A protein has these predicted regions:
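Class I SAM-dependent methyltransferase SAM/SAH-binding core
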Residues: 30, 34-71
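Alpha-helix C-terminal capping/helix-to-coil transition sites in glycosyltransferase folds
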Residues: 17, 78-79, 105
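A short SAM/SAH-binding and catalytic strip from SAM-dependent methyltransferases
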Residues: 82-94
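Class I SAM-dependent methyltransferase "Motif I" SAM/SAH-binding loop
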Residues: 25-27
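A short acidic, Gly/Pro-enriched loop at the edge of an enzyme's catalytic core
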Residues: 73-82
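Conserved alpha-helix/loop element of class I SAM-dependent methyltransferases that forms part
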Residues: 2-18
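S-adenosyl-L-methionine-dependent methyltransferase catalytic module, highlighting the catalytic core
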Residues: 97-101, 108-201
Length: 201
């Protein structure tokens, strides 16, 4: 999986063979396509942009157009073995409500996100006094879809508030990947560029 984002490799490692999977905000279907080939999942996708839905369908993927903030409520409780939200929670209008819905409809939920507490982001903001632009967060504030950026600590606190169980955390930067049973160490809020969480209700 060398040509894939690091978080996608980590996500794939957390998905069980043959699972029923819903990929929310699936983009062009990169992750779904890999999961079907590598883990033989029964996969579905939900994507807000019609052009991306069209790309997915052209690849033979089962993807529908929809808005996570509105359409997740249509799915029955525990209707999937695993629900995935990859690099999308910070772009949703109501992340708390979306996370609650993911937990409701999936036996397990996987969430990956960029860490706004990463030391390079902090340093960039401190030195420039402007919204940071880094390799991972590479758009100007007026162009980005990231409307609710958060840190690893913020996300852990939200899980605590919603009484969501963190079963495993994978954190990484350009040099290291670390895996934690349950919650990550506090220092990961500074040294990790991204994180992947495996969650249950």
């Amino acid at each position: 999986m060398n040509n894939y984002r690091k978080d996608l490799s980590s996500i794939v490692s957390l998905v069980n063979q043959g699972s029923r999977v819903l990929d929310v905000g699936c983009g062009d279907g990169e992750l779904l396509e890999y999961l079907k080939k590598d883990k033989e999942v029964i996969g579905q996708g939900l994507e807000i942009r019609q052009d991306r839905v069209n790309k997915c369908v052209a690849k033979g993927l089962s993807v529908i157009q929809g808005d996570a903030a509105k359409d997740l409520s249509l799915y029955p409780n525990k209707s999937f073995d695993c629900v995935i939200l990859s690099q999308t929670i910070q772009a949703t209008g109501k992340p708390k409500e979306v996370l609650s819905e993911l937990i409701r409809i999936g036996r397990e939920t996987i969430v990956s996100l960029p860490n706004f507490g990463f030391w390079e982001v902090r340093l960039n903001l401190f030195l420039t006094g402007k919204m940071p632009i880094t390799k991972r967060l590479n758009e100007n504030w007026y162009e980005t879809q990231n409307i609710h950026l958060c840190t690893i600590a913020d996300f852990v606190n939200l899980c605590d508030e919603l009484k969501i169980n963190i079963k495993k955390t994978i954190t990484f930067n350009s040099k290291k990947i670390k895996t934690f049973k349950e919650k990550p160490r506090a220092i990961e809020n500074v040294i990790a560029e991204e994180a992947v969480f495996l969650l249950t209700s």
